[in-house]
Amino acid sequence: MKPWLEELVRALTTAEAELGPRAEQGTPAARAAGSARLAQARLRTASLLARGPIPASLRTGDRSDEAVAVYCEALADKARSLIERGEAALAACAPAAAASPRAWRAALCAP
């Protein structure tokens, strides 16, 4: 695994460990903020995966087209999963934001 990808996975794992409990506990405002931040972390990670660099070693050689296609499809699968999980966090955010006394918090949950 490339260093940038390892760091990306490590950062998301840390964010999910910290933000997951915040999205499920506390006041409606705290749950909305935790869910929104969790969604943001997942969606940003998906975006970075989908646009990540293709290793030079895959871009050369006789079967480079096939290798690049397999690599890109694997990253796209991971990105799709993160998008689904990010959208689920946004869906969980909406009721918490609506229950919050400040209406502006609903904007935290907008896709």
Predicted regions and their residues:
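Acidic, polar-rich low-complexity tracts and alpha-helical solenoid repeat scaffolds
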Residues: 1-111
